[in-house]
Curated annotation (Swiss-Prot):
Its main location: membrane. One of its GO terms (molecular function) is ATP binding. It comes from Photobacterium profundum (strain SS9). GO terms for cellular component: plasma membrane. GO terms for biological process: phosphate ion transmembrane transport. This is Phosphate import ATP-binding protein PstB 1. It is a peripheral membrane protein. ATP binds at G58, P59, S60, G61, C62, G63, K64, S65.
Amino acid sequence: MLSVNPSMGLFEPLDLASLPDDKTAMSIEGLDLHYGNTQALFDINMRIAKGQVTSFIGPSGCGKSTLLRCINRMNELVDGCRVDGKIMLHGQNIYDSKVDVASLRRRVGMVFQRPNPFPKSIYENVVYGLRLQGLKERRVLDDAVEKSLRGAALWDEVKDRLHENAFGLSGGQQQRLVIARAIAIEPEVLLLDEPTSALDPISTLTIEELINDLKTKYTVIIVTHNMQQAARVSDQTAFMHMGELVEYSSTNDIFTTPKEKRTEDYITGRYG
């Protein structure tokens, strides 16, 4: 079994099946997803703990990124996608026809596998979402840039070149810039889809340390193929296989005493 970082808050395990509303960031209820005639997710039910890091793990094609993209309705950009069931955020189903998708994505930010800064300056990357919200006052924008870059552990590295093109940053710096851009609009939930898969080991470690800091202000959900990474950074772990949620528990339990044989087989390398 993998060792779990004891600094990740695992000594106060939550009963995820009966997580109270005040400790729940969102709940997923009876979620199915189809791409055309192909079903990709099957009856997913889970409560995401507020202010913690939850990881989705499983073999390629198991549905973990698909589930992640349901949480801010990114899957709707795929032709033929149909979602049934509910994802409740503060008592409202995000799939309700009355929900404004742009507003939802401000509340639920997302960072993708490869760094995707805009072809703009570092400064303009960070304030992009704020400008879309109509913020124009320079002092407010300046404060937001510093706060967000500090929150992404990047300020000290770029504070003297904020107006240089973001493409001049290293890959790891670009990914932290993307995180700064995401948190500048102060989301409630931050989704990370394999955020270190394109980075070198040193940049990966920096991002992992950042994730631990981010959970003090945001609920973080991360998809990762790297089981060691899930063990290091997350408080809760969900194991998925063939579109099903096989097991969902504290990271400590998943990696040391899994209840399901499929979970044990995966984390011990018998398949995946």
